[in-house]
Design a protein with these regions (language model features):
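Bilobed periplasmic-binding protein-like "clamshell/Venus-flytrap" ligand-binding domains
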Residues: 182-198
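M16 family metallopeptidases and their MPP-like homologs
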Residues: 35-45, 72-123, 128-176, 193-200
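Generic solvent-exposed, charged/amphipathic alpha-helical segments
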Residues: 2, 60-61, 72, 115, ...
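Active/ligand-binding-proximal structured segments within catalytic/core domains
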Residues: 38, 49-65, 75
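An aromatic/glycine/proline-enriched structural segment found at the starts
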Residues: 1-46, 203
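Generic recognition of flexible, low-complexity loop/linker segments
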Residues: 25, 86-88, 182-186
Length: 203
């Protein structure tokens, strides 16, 4: 990447408090099935620290909500979720929000199941075997992308925009441990930092 002329642009953001605005938001729309997003407002980071948090959050949520996990199987068996259930990390220099989302007849019950699963994992730790399998799978998928010119170009651009080197993700991913993931989960996935957004059908 060739650096361009510095135009002296400055982005100024107001200071963001750690407290959430509200614990839940409910909206209505002409939809067939109620949809929800449960997000956790976590401490923001930048550069390598942001990369580490993103990887840890991705792996921790993947283990917590894996299709073979007690959380996923329990909610599926009780009809609380379907195949749309997924996780996502929404983050940048000044925000970091892990999200769990999908369709449900009872989003409040889903929230309580997730809270209970997080509390259990914080106490006893995540499944180490599943964590290692998920980490190695992510590592392999990342390495495979290096065979694609477009993927490498996107990696270079995204890395430059994030203030990290193109191969920092590979290095960071290979060094993460189950202890790192458990620590992140205990410190960041706090019920008081969670907010539930619900979109339900208009009556």
């Amino acid at each position: 990447l060739k650096p361009c002329e510095d135009m002296q642009l400055e982005c100024i953001f107001p200071e963001e408090p750690m407290e959430i605005v509200r614990a839940e938001t409910v909206e209505t729309a002409p939809i067939g099935t109620t949809m929800f997003v449960l997000g956790y407002k976590c401490k923001p980071a930048s550069g390598l620290e942001n990369l580490k948090k993103e990887l840890l959050a991705t792996l921790a949520l993947k283990v917590l909500t894996h299709v073979t996990s007690p959380l996923y199987q329990g909610m599926l068996k009780d009809g609380l979720i379907n195949e749309t259930f997924s996780t996502e990390i929404f983050n940048g220099d000044d925000f970091f929000v892990p999200m769990l989302e999908g369709e449900s007849k009872d989003p409040y019950a889903v929230r309580e199941r997730i809270f209970a699963a997080v509390e259990e994992a914080a106490k006893n730790g995540l499944d180490e075997t599943l964590f290692e399998n998920s980490r190695k799978n992510a590592y392999g998928s990342l390495i495979m992308k290096f065979n694609n010119v477009e993927a490498v170009a996107n990696l270079m651009i995204n890395s430059a925009m994030s203030g990290i080197a193109p191969f920092d993700t590979v290095t960071m991913l290979s060094s993460l441990t189950i202890e790192d993931a458990n620590r992140w989960l205990r410190e960041e996935l706090l019920p008081q930092q969670a907010t539930l957004s619900i979109m339900k059908n208009q009556d």
